[in-house]
């Protein structure tokens, strides 16, 4: 299954050893995220470290392991879908535009997000962590 994964799902997998982390490492999932993710990571890295209660070195190691299972896609590969995605997301949550645009460009099976705002759009199916757990019987 091919999914675009949103930043908060990735952050959750870094913060806590959980089912979310196991799903990210699950071989039946091919995951993608926009390069914009790294801007979000940089903004929130201190909070992620604080919530995880781990040393910075361990947090960075976890980021490397988790991101080795996620394809980071540069903006130029989905930029032509940004205007349409923005039209859809501008009144919902414009910060999710990149995730929707990427999903539209890659023609994935859906977007993995626990953010209710992303599920308000009807262009691309959105899966929560709970739905993926049920789907894969994990």
For the regions a language model picked out, list residue spans one by one.
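Short, well-structured N-terminal submotif of metal-dependent ribonuclease cores
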Residues: 1-35
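Acidic, PIN/NYN-like endoribonuclease modules and their adjacent C-terminal/linker elements
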Residues: 104-138
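PIN-domain endoribonuclease scaffold, especially VapC-family toxins
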Residues: 26-28, 35-84
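Active-site neighborhoods of divalent-metal-dependent phosphate/nucleic-acid chemistry enzymes
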Residues: 72-110
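Alpha-helix capping/helix-boundary segments
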Residues: 10, 37, 99, 117-118
